[in-house]
């Protein structure tokens, strides 16, 4: 990891995906995940005890990209009393009556806490740009507003970790087909 300075251009990192069920040594993967979860739980306790900083984890991905399962698997050993998961779907009528960051700001972590965003404020520039919902001047201005918003969070002691979980179009199609076969996923 490295700190990204204000408005610095960042190149995406190309990492091999972690092993998934049925690939590689599953037992070794689970043992490593358990060890990392223990370490994460220790960090969470220290963050909570210190009460000076907070952590915001932002997960972005296409539909079926693994956001929910990542949250369930990675954070299963963390004390649920000091962690909050916020999922950002299409804005409600009330949320649309406010500026686009209003609903996001309400979910940011207080000191000593961890917030995980399942999707985020980036939807308000990505979706509206791709679907041409707002004029270009609006989404361009939102980029600056997001940068300013995140700078304020960082200045107040919030560390922001951003992850884009990428899957190929073929993997996405496979996951959609798998969902059709699993009643718990058909909602």
What are these language model-derived features?
Residues 1-187:
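Glycine-rich phosphate-binding loop of ATP-dependent small-molecule kinases
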